[in-house]
A protein has these predicted regions:
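Secreted/periplasmic carbohydrate-active enzymes, especially glycoside hydrolases
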Residues: 1-163, 171, 182
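Flexible loop residues that form catalytic
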Residues: 168
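Catalytic cores of alpha/beta
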Residues: 177
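Proline-centered loop/turn at the N-terminus of a beta-strand
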Residues: 184-186
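Acidic, His- and aromatic-enriched active-site or binding-groove loops in soluble protein domains
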Residues: 189-193
């Protein structure tokens, strides 16, 4: 598995830690783990030994002047395509992931009559416009990519920039989250109960 942790994201710099989880059937003296986004000119590698079992290798990325991900009304929802690859002897594997680089924070400042409650996206105040989302169908296998596309496109057409996924539903298929990323729509994900 591959996990991207955005440590710091500003218009000037993005620091991302990429944790690559590697299952090895035996001890290996050396494995090369590379994370790259060739179209963006980004690449970093780490060489590490592997032990039999599960290994975690962290590859730091430092990106100057990153193209930030924005909600649809604030800018372009730019997505980087990163490829994480592992090479050890004759064995190799890779995984490609698309992610948007952004900073998002909930602002809770004290004011005269209470506390603020709004989001900042990449340092800009965000007026959240959205809806609660429940599963498109109780029979999940009937929900196709086309159904997800229509649902997300309809939300975008009425200028929504955030969908709250209801906690009494399900964790949606990856295509739901990918389409939201592409369309510049934030997801407020409730935990299931």
């Amino acid at each position: 598995d591959v996990f991207y942790r955005q440590q710091e994201v500003t218009a000037r710099r993005a620091r991302v830690e990429v944790e690559v989880e590697i299952a090895s059937v035996r001890d290996l003296a050396e494995a090369v783990v590379t994370v790259a986004s060739p179209g963006e000119g980004i690449e970093a590698s780490v060489t590490a030994p592997l032990r039999s079992g599960i290994n975690k290798v962290t590859v730091p990325l430092d990106i100057a002047s990153p193209k930030l991900w924005w909600t649809r009304e604030l800018g372009e929802p730019h997505l980087y395509e990163f490829r994480a690859s592992v090479a050890a002897g004759d064995a190799s594997d890779s995984r490609t992931t698309r992610i948007g680089l952004r900073s998002l924070r909930l602002v809770r400042d004290k004011v005269a009559d209470g506390t603020t409650f709004y989001f900042e996206l990449n340092g800009e105040p965000l007026f959240a416009k959205g809806a609660n989302y429940i599963p498109c169908d109780v029979f999940l296998p009937r929900v196709t990519r086309a159904v997800y596309e229509k649902t997300i496109d309809d939300a975008a057409a009425v200028n929504m920039n955030m969908l709250r996924v209801w906690g009494g539903g399900v964790y949606e298929d990856d295509v739901f989250y990918e389409l939201c990323d592409e369309r510049g729509i934030l997801v407020w994900q409730d935990f299931m109960f």
